[in-house]
């Protein structure tokens, strides 16, 4: 036994070849691409040959291929046979048969040597054969794993070794995970701007690759000999979840030993060079697109043919083949040399149409040759600035980067002599940063040569303090995104550089934003920097907010997020706190896999923070994040909106919107837009007069010089700026300054003679302008190339190409003709006739490919999606602004026009370069597979099991199974395709055309119900515009006309018979009375339900008698009235049934809870109940109150989301209701007893509120009078029933008509009428058909019925009687809060509207949850929708939404505009609708202004902070002032000498020194520049007209809006200062900084924070006001 063990240990398992023999193997390699199921088309190829291996030196062997043959496959798998590719075999035979040498030791293939004549493609095929010999045998283990080298790289391999002693063989099984590689061979193109979603890949992978090998080894004296080797490799791809199916590329190899002979082998005479290892070497497939194959020996000729085809066939409108032809042109240019491109350019540079196509195709070619040509043309000034910008920037983003290309770009971009155009240089610098990003994408540390030009440019700009170039350098460094650039960026970050704090805030923000792309490589370093910036409270709030945004984008750890939350607990800036808190809270709702860890961390952090931050209004900075991720699709999208505000103004200082996409286990930022509006609000509020032209205010400046620690707010140079990013790279940015605005205003006002551009355009339009525009674009080229085991590259790629064309012909006739002194403003008052013939069209071609791609052969699967749209527009527009007329006239549709065409089809393709005419392209879903299920026969279970057994034999066919016998066997299972066809047309008979839709779809979803299988197949749909011919006269032209003003009535063609409307009013009882009935507010109608139910029959009979009496006038109206009567009866019956049902439901609910009510406390029993009982027994309640009662009774089931919070808020409602409710309403008492939530309260309109207060105790006696009062209201007057067109002309008329050949007209007309009475404004809109016999109409009527109620009714159909919807808006109270109720109610709506309602109802709960609404299942009226908005505080409202099946509510919703509310508002009546609408502009305007009040020793700052301060006597304090470098006003306050309770005010505005002094008589004195102005002479206006002084109440009011002072009021005791919106964040003094930062209100002039308001002022500098009056000025800020 010992001897046997020792012998077994000496056995060598490593494969080897004897040096004296030549081994001949039979080799076969097959690769196929398609879906895994049988019965569908596949494409692939087979390579089989003889292989001889012999030793030529120590451990060096010679491999020679004999009798190679290549066969192609394209057909139904596995039925179709392989067919020989004879021409391709013949072309490659000379290379395939050339011997190669390789090193082979212990089963490992070393270096490979081959002749230079052998191409990389052929050598890779030989590597595939050698890969079969790669074995790593361990004698000490039978099962083991390791990282093994191979053709695909160094990947994880698992071995299992079995020894069969009886058969004297060793079986080795090897499997490789091609997704787990230390060094994976792959090539990614077009993915540099996306990054991997690691969490997505943990869940599912879109691509997987695996390989399995089986070896049979025969022991020999020197080791083992490989007698047979088989391999199977599978790559799968799906854009969706892999569990739902994927397309596969399957490769198989088989190497079988046939003979071993003792033959002397001669070494080849030609020199064999080292061509690398066994790893795959990329070759020509990098430049070879997988969708086209052609010979490139003479590309110039082919390029000219393609160019000619594109130019000639895409002038009028784009052709469907234009995108594919453009891709072909791009591929041909990739094969060109520099001389070829030069020759083509010289031939076509003078021809504008050809020139444009060439300049668009060269950047898409993206080769070094094309880029070099573009740079030479720019340096030689052969391109215009517009052409250079477009061509160079696109080329820099698409070109394949290497060291030479980067160096070439740097020499061009950073040499000012080359790029003299500022716009071109700006975009080129940004593009250079993006180029560096792609060049250094695979390495952590980028080469210094690439970054040096950017670093030098940044250092130079910062050293020269050049603001614009510094911003450009920072943005370029941000595009590059390299960690080595951090040191340059830190020079602009405060806290890291001594001079950075002096830079403008915009530069500091841009420096922080430049760290975002760097964080993708060095997240830890960026987190450290941004955290340090965030913690520095001395920095500007905007810088800190952007730092927190960048920090959270790096997805910090739980510990770092907790540190951030801890810092927020001590945060003094409300802007920073609001922004960061809202950002973290928004992330907690994220469902994207990439944010799982961050979402959990933020969820914990938010719980640590105060809920008060949730209640900050929208004046404070906010961050919003919304995303969705669908796991079945493994795709998602996200949107981020960051709103940054500096001074709590309505207009934010910055807005950033970013959109993200999750697809194919990667994340990309396709679009980001940023807008910075700092300084824009100030310009909008100011006049055009320049502040710089003001005379110096000497006294103010003299005081400012003496202020210790003065720190003026920096003035803005840039009013607004914007940028756009695509895929994380900033493409462009622009800035708006005062100079730009002045130039724009000047361009409008100056005569055309001085405006050369406008004059040229006007003259060209008068002569007639014609243009043929075309713009091709390679939208996407995304590729991944992987090697396969047989040595051919497998490619998965996506191409999107688009071509847009526009044929434009425009001619204008202007009356009167423009003269030399004609300006743009006068041009708008001319009569302009514009003849336009424009045909825009666009074609797009998307191709997804999976398969083999080389320069000699291509096989695989292609999915083609084509889209084409054409919108021909030929019309004549007439514009006459003086007459207020606009008219468009066009010809009718004469022939069928395909407006939109979409098609998608999957193919199995195979083509080789030697026989392009024999290329095959078969649908993946064959036609014979589409069979009707009715033709299928039922098979029993036995037959089915036999069929599966037979089919199982072919589940994994090996190379031997691919014989001719199998291909022709009848065992193949037939498939049937899912087939669907749709078609529909919508006719516009009045205009003689129809829009038709046709769709057809066939897919393979019958195999597997998944998104991928639904795409695979054939799909086609189109939308066409067709002429619709009728038996009547033909249509000659179509006209659209809009007329406003006094001539609107003249455009009305058909005058509607007014008696039909009058009759309808009489039968239905007055349109507004019906409206009032539909829109009765809950609790408003005091008639009991029972009494209303008993009166229904009499009401119906009276209505019938009324209709019958009116019907006796004519027989035609009789039939009409009978129809209307039936409809009315049906409506009433429906309403009665619903009212009875709601009443009974409410009654049952009350009975169930009667027992519970009797157990309430004693003081609850003492509440007035007589009125409740009488109301329930005699008065009853209407349907609305019943519904409310039912809602109230069911309101005790608190919402699951936040029971405690909701309950506490409901107590607030209870307390408010207890304090304000004085009526004896039983519903009120019940509500108080139940502690109801918001949805349980009944909304009480203003009239209902007054009615119960005035008539309590006499409910029964007042019901009839209330009813009569209601009937006598304004809604029931005869005057309201009239048609407004009888007494006033329409305010506008719109006519859409078709003029027929017989002179008649048909179409539609719309007219609007108004009644401008102040008390009850009213609007009516009437739309009718022009044809006299048509009764179709749309009637809309809206009226402000009272100060508290507005109503609108819309009816449409035959004489406006088929459908109707009513809407009302009523003010009132919800509990004790002023409220507004908007209610919509309908009786009949179209079926399409009902379907839309049902669809929306499915998404409402989810959307409401995302918006923070709570939900309660409640059966509300089925034909009613209600929204109630209750004002609970000046900054918040409660929202209640009642839909038919659900109730939604949200409390404390922040609103951007502060609503002025006094404490006594709870006891007063609600504001009326008229006052609300009138006050809305005032509220918005007031919300932009700030007010400060000082009375005795009490102060209220601009931001609402209250404090007390005892001023020392005789010392002036700065109450409020303009805190910028150029001070425009200052208001000072001191204690009057005559009394401690009186104050004296001094205001310095512009060049005026205004003193307002108290007197002992209780009045005030006014002095201007030390000259007393009697109050009797007020009002006063200075010479400039900017300062106004007037008497107000008991004091004086000063207004100087031009200088930022809205008003200054003083009456001797109280001072009130109100500043304009432009002064947000620009004031200082005792009134504060007016920036919304309540926690930082007591900042001192040098920026330090005081401990509180009670700190006594330090002795300030004293200044003599005059030589005789010594008045000290104590500087307090």
Curated annotation (Swiss-Prot):
InterPro entries: Lipid_transp_b-sht_shell (IPR015819), Lipovitellin_superhlx_dom (IPR011030), Vitellinogen_b-sht_N (IPR015816), Vitellinogen_b-sht_shell (IPR015258), Vitellinogen_b-sht_shell_sf (IPR037088), Vitellinogen_open_b-sht (IPR015255), Vitellinogen_open_b-sht_sub1 (IPR015817), Vitellogenin/Apolipophorin (IPR050733). It holds the Pfam family Vitellogenin_N. Induction: By steroids (estrogen). GO terms for biological process: cellular response to estrogen stimulus; response to estradiol. Residues 1490-1675 form the VWFD domain. Residues 1098-1122, 1169-1196, 1215-1229, 1260-1273 have a biased composition (Low complexity). Residues 1-8 form the signal peptide. Residues 1197-1212 have a biased composition (Basic residues). Glycans are attached at residues 1182, 1202, 1217-1218. Residues 1089-1232, 1252-1280, 1636-1659 are annotated as: Disordered. Residues 1123-1145, 1636-1649 have a biased composition (Basic and acidic residues). SMART domains: DUF1943 (SM01169), DUF1944 (SM01170), LPD_N (SM00638), VWD (SM00216). One of its GO terms (molecular function) is nutrient reservoir activity. The keyword Phosphoprotein applies. The keyword Glycoprotein applies. Keywords: Disulfide bond, Glycoprotein, Phosphoprotein, Signal, Storage protein. It comes from the Eukaryota. Disulfide bonds join 1492-1631, 1515-1674. Found in liver, testis and undifferentiated gonads of estrogen-treated fish. Not detected in the brain and spleen. Precursor of the major egg-yolk proteins that are sources of nutrients during early development of oviparous organisms. This is Vitellogenin. It comes from Acipenser transmontanus.
């Amino acid at each position: 036994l010992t001897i046997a063990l020792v012998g077994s240990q000496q056995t060598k398992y490593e494969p080897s070849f004897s040096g004296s023999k030549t081994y001949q193997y039979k080799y076969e390699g097959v690769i196929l691409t398609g879906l895994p199921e049988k019965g569908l088309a596949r494409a692939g190829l087979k390579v089989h040959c003889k292989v001889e291996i012999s030793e030529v030196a120590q451990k060096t062997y010679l491999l020679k291929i004999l009798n190679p043959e290549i066969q192609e496959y394209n057909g139904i798998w596995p039925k179709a046979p392989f067919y020989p590719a004879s021409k391709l075999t013949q072309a490659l035979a000379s290379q395939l048969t050339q011997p190669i040498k390789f090193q082979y030791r212990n089963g490992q293939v070393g270096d490979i040597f081959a002749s230079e004549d052998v191409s990389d493609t052929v050598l890779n095929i030989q590597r595939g054969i050698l890969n079969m010999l790669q074995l790593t045998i361990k004698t000490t283990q039978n099962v083991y794993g390791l990282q093994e080298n191979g053709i695909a790289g160094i990947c994880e391999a698992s071995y299992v070794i079995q020894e069969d002693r009886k058969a004297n063989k060793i079986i080795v099984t090897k499997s490789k995970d091609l997704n787990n590689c230390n060094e994976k061979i792959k090539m990614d193109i077009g993915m540099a701007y996306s990054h991997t979603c690691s969490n997505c890949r943990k869940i599912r992978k879109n691509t997987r690759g695996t390989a399995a090998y089986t070896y049979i080894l025969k022991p020999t004296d020197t080791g083992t000999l490989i007698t047979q080797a088989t391999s199977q490799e599978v790559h799968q791809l799906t854009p969706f979840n892999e569990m739902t199916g994927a397309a596969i590329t399957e490769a198989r190899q088989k190497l079988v030993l046939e003979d071993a002979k003792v033959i002397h082998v001669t070494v080849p005479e030609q020199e064999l060079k080292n061509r690398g290892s066994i790893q795959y070497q990329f070759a020509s497939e990098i430049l070879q697109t997988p969708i086209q194959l052609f010979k490139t020996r003479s590309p110039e000729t082919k390029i000219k043919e393609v160019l000619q085809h594109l130019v000639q066939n895409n002038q009028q409108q784009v052709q469907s083949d234009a995108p594919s032809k453009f891709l072909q042109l791009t591929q041909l240019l990739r094969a060109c040399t520099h001389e070829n491109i030069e020759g083509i350019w010289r031939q076509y540079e003078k021809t504008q149409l050809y020139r444009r196509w060439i300049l668009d195709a060269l950047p898409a070619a993206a080769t070094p040759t094309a880029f070099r040509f573009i740079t030479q043309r720019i340096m030689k000034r052969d391109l215009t600035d517009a052409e250079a910008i477009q061509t160079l920037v696109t080329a820099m983003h698409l070109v394949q980067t290497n060291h030479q290309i980067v160096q070439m770009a740097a020499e061009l971009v950073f040499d000012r002599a080359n790029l003299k155009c500022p716009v071109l240089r700006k975009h080129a610098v940004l593009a250079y940063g993006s180029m560096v990003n792609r060049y250094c994408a695979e390495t952590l540390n980028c080469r210094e040569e690439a970054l040096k030009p950017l670093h030098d440019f940044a250092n130079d700009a910062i050293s020269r303090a050049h603001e614009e170039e510094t911003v450009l350098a920072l943005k370029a460094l941000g595009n590059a995104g390299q960690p080595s650039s951090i040191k340059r960026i830190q020079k602009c970050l405060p806290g890291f550089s001594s001079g950075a704090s002096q830079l403008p805030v915009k530069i500091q923000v841009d420096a922080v934003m430049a760290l975002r792309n760097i964080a993708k490589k060095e997240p830890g370093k960026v987190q450290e920097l941004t955290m340090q910036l965030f913690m520095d409270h001395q920095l500007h709030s905007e810088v800190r907010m952007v730092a927190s945004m960048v920090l959270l984008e790096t997805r910090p750890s739980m510990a770092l997020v907790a540190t951030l939350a801890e810092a927020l607990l001590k945060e003094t800036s409300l802007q920073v706190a609001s922004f960061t808190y809202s950002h973290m809270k928004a992330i907690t709702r994220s469902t994207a896999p990439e944010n799982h860890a961050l979402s959990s961390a933020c969820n914990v952090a938010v719980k640590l923070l105060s809920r008060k931050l949730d209640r900050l209004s929208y004046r404070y900075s906010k961050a919003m994040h919304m995303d969705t991720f669908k796991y079945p699709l493994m795709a998602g999208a996200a949107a981020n909106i960051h709103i940054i505000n500096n001074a709590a103004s309505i207009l934010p200082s910055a807005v950033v919107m970013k959109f993200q996409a999750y697809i194919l286990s990667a994340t990309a930022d396709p679009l980001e837009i940023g807008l910075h509006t700092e300084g824009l609000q100030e310009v909008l509020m100011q006049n055009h007069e320049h502040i710089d032209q003001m005379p110096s205010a000497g006294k103010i400046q003299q005081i400012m010089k003496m202020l210790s620690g003065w720190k003026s707010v920096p003035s803005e140079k840039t009013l607004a700026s914007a940028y756009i990013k695509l895929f994380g790279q900033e493409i462009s940015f622009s800035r708006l300054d005062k100079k730009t605005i002045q130039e724009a205003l000047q361009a409008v006002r100056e005569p055309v003679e001085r405006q050369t551009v406008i004059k040229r355009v006007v003259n060209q339009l008068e002569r007639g302008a014609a243009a043929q525009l075309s713009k091709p674009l390679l939208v996407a080229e995304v590729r991944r190339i992987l090697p396969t085991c047989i040595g051919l590259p497998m490619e998965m790629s996506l191409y999107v190409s688009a071509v847009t064309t526009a044929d434009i012909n425009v001619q204008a006739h202007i009356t009167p003709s423009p003269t030399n002194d004609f300006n743009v403003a006068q041009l708008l008052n001319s009569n302009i006739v514009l003849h336009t013939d424009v045909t825009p069209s666009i074609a797009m071609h998307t191709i997804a490919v999976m398969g083999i791609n080389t320069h000699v052969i291509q096989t695989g699967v292609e999915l083609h999606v084509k889209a084409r749209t054409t919108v021909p527009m030929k019309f004549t527009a007439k514009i006459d602004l003086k007459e207020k007329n606009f008219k468009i006239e066009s010809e009718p549709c004469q022939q069928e026009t395909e407006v939109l065409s979409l098609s998608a089809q999957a193919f199995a393709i195979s083509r080789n370069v030697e026989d392009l005419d024999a290329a095959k392209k078969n649908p993946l879903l064959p036609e014979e597979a589409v069979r009707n299920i009715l033709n299928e026969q039922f098979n029993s279970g036995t037959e089915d099991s036999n069929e599966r057994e037979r089919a199982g034999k072919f589940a994994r066919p090996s190379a031997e199974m691919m014989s001719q016998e199998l291909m022709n066997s009848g065992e193949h299972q037939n498939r049937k395709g899912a087939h669907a066809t749709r078609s529909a047309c919508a006719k516009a008979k009045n205009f003689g055309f129809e829009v038709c839709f046709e769709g057809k779809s066939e897919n393979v979803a019958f195999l597997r119900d998944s998104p991928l299988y639904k795409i695979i197949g054939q799909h086609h749909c189109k939308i066409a515009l067709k002429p619709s011919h009728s038996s009547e006269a033909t249509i000659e032209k179509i006209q659209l006309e809009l007329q406003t003003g006094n001539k609107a009535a003249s455009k009305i063609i058909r005058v509607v018979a007014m008696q039909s409307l009058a009759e309808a009013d009489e039968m239905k009882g007055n349109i507004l009375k019906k409206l009032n009935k539909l829109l009765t507010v809950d609790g408003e109608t005091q008639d009991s339900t029972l009494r209303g139910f008993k009166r229904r029959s009499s009401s119906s009979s009276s209505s019938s008698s009324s209709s019958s009496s009116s019907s006796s006038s004519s027989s035609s109206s009789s039939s009409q009235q009978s129809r209307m009567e039936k409809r009315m009866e049906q409506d009433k019956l429906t309403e009665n049934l619903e009212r009875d049902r709601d009443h009974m439901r409410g009654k049952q609910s009350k009975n169930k809870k009667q027992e519970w009510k009797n157990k309430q406390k004693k003081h609850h029993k003492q509440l007035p109940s007589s009125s409740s009982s009488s109301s329930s027994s005699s008065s009853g309640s209407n349907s609305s109150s019943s519904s409310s009662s039912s809602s109230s009774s069911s309101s005790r089931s608190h919402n699951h989301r936040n029971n405690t919070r909701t309950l506490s808020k409901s107590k607030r409602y209870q307390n408010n209701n207890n304090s304000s409710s004085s009526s004896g309403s039983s519903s009120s008492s019940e509500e108080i007893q139940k502690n109801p939530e918001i949805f349980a309260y009944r909304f009480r309109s203003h009239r209902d509120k007054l009615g119960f207060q005035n008539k309590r105790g006499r409910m029964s006696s007042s019901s009839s009078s209330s009813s009569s009062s209601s009937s006598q209201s304004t809604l029931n007057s005869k005057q309201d029933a009239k048609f407004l067109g009888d007494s006033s002309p329409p305010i506008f008329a719109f006519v859409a008509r078709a003029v027929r050949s017989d002179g008649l007209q048909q179409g539609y007309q719309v007219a609007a009428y108004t009644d401008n009475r102040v008390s009850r404004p009213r609007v009516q809109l009437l739309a009718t058909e022009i044809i006299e016999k048509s009764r179709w109409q749309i009637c809309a009527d809206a009226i402000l019925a009272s100060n508290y109620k507005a109503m609108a009714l819309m009816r449409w159909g035959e004489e406006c009687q088929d459908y109707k919807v009513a809407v009302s808006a009523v003010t009132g109270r919800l509990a004790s809060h002023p409220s507004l109720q908007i209610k919509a109610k309908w009786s009949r709506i179209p079926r399409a509207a009902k379907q839309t309602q049902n669809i929306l109802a499915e998404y409402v709960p989810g959307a409401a949850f995302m918006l923070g609404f709570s939900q309660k299942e409640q059966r509300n009226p089925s034909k009613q929708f209600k929204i109630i908005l209750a004002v609970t505080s000046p900054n918040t409202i409660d929202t209640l939404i009642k839909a038919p099946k659900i109730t939604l509510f949200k409390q404390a919703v922040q609103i951007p505009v502060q609503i002025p509310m006094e404490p006594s508002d709870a006891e007063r009546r609600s504001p009326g609708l008229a006052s609300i609408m009138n006050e809305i502009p005032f509220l918005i305007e007031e919300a932009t202004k700030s007010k400060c009040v000082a009375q005795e020793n009490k102060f209220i700052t601009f931001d609402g902070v209250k404090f007390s301060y005892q001023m020392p006597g005789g010392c002036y304090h700065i109450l409020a002032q303009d805190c910028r470098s150029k001070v425009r006003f200052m208001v000072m306050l001191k204690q009057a000498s005559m009394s401690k309770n009186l104050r004296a005010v001094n205001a310095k505005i512009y060049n005026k020194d205004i003193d307002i002094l108290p007197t002992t008589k209780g009045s005030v004195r006014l002095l201007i520049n030390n000259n007393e102005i009697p109050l009797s002479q007020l009002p006063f206006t200075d010479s400039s007209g900017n300062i106004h002084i007037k008497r107000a109440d008991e004091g004086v009011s000063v207004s100087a809006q031009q200088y930022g002072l809205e008003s200054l009021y003083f009456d001797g005791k109280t001072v009130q200062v109100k500043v304009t919106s432009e002064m947000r964040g620009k004031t200082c003094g005792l009134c504060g900084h007016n920036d919304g930062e309540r926690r930082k209100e007591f900042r001192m002039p040098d920026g330090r924070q005081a401990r509180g308001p009670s700190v006594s002022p330090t002795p300030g500098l004293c200044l003599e006001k005059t030589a005789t009056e010594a008045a000290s000025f104590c500087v307090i800020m």
